UniProtKB/Swiss-Prot annotation:
Function summary: Part of the twin-arginine translocation (Tat) system that transports large folded proteins containing a characteristic twin-arginine motif in their signal peptide across membranes. Together with TatC, TatB is part of a receptor directly interacting with Tat signal peptides. TatB may form an oligomeric binding site that transiently accommodates folded Tat precursor proteins before their translocation.
Keyword Oxidoreductase: no
Membrane-crossing segments per the record: 2-22
Main location: membrane
UniProt keywords, alphabetically: Cell membrane, Membrane, Protein transport, Translocation, Transmembrane, Transmembrane helix, Transport
Name the record gives this protein: Sec-independent protein translocase protein TatB
Membrane topology: Single-pass membrane protein
Protein family (similarity comment): Belongs to the TatB family.
Region (Disordered): 89-142
């Protein structure tokens, strides 16, 4: 719950506690909060052990689908689609449809023919902005 709270935030909370509660009531409030958290943790641990005792082996059967849900929660949308709908075949995302490594398409020729060295070769291929004419394509950004 407080995984993202750093030392700076804790210092702000302590200063706010000093201002709101005052120095005489702050230690008591901290003790009360720590005791309440400890008691809640004991209740949760007791409930878990009681469920484990009452359900026996069924408790592990209940935990199995929950662990699968946790694994799914950590997946990216692309990984979930690849695993469950495409049976692990991510060629639709990568564009590598050829499984044996041989390309069925003939080798493509370059768009611009190379010119002979000379004054015409000094003209840059890129526009004045310094960017090439083609925009990079990111399959994960869609």
């Amino acid at each position: 719950m407080f995984a993202n709270v750093g030392w700076g935030e804790m210092l702000v909370l302590v200063i706010a506690g000093l201002v709101i509660l005052g120095p005489e009531r702050l230690p008591g409030a901290i003790r009360w909060t720590a005791g309440a958290v400890r008691q809640a943790r004991d209740y949760v641990t007791g409930a878990t052990s009681q469920l484990r005792e009452e359900l026996g082996t069924d408790f592990d059967d209940l935990r199995e689908p929950l662990s699968e849900l946790q694994r799914l929660r950590g997946m990216t949308p692309r990984a979930a689609l690849t695993k469950h709908l495409l049976d692990g075949d991510d060629s639709i995302f990568t564009g590598k449809f050829d499984q044996n490594g041989k390309s069925e398409k003939p080798e493509q020729k370059p768009e611009k023919p190379q010119s002979a060295p000379g004054p015409a070769a000094a003209v840059p291929d890129q526009p004045a902005g310094g960017r090439s004419g083609s925009t990079p394509y990111d399959t994960d950004a869609t």
